[in-house]
Swiss-Prot record:
Keyword Ribonucleoprotein among UniProt keywords: no
Main subcellular location of this protein, as a coarse class: secreted
Keywords attached to this entry: Disulfide bond, Glycoprotein, Protease inhibitor, Repeat, Secreted, Serine protease inhibitor
Places the protein is found: Secreted
Cited PANTHER family: OVOMUCOID-LIKE-RELATED (PTHR47729:SF1), SERINE PEPTIDASE INHIBITOR, KAZAL TYPE 2, TANDEM DUPLICATE 1-RELATED (PTHR47729)
Superkingdom per UniProt: Eukaryota
Protein name: Ovomucoid
GO cellular component, one term: extracellular region
Amino acid sequence: LPAVSVDCSEYPKPDCTTEERPLCGSDNKTYGNKCNFCNAVVESNGTLTLSHFGKC
């Protein structure tokens, strides 16, 4: 299975939209969209990765 990844180079961003495009993080937490996920990735210093697209 190919590794799934998201480009978070443009983050963090101060404001995320409420758009529902869920992603599942390696912490087994569902993030509402790429912005929320990428902000969390930046805060985790890169330890958080994408598990898969969609809810956990």
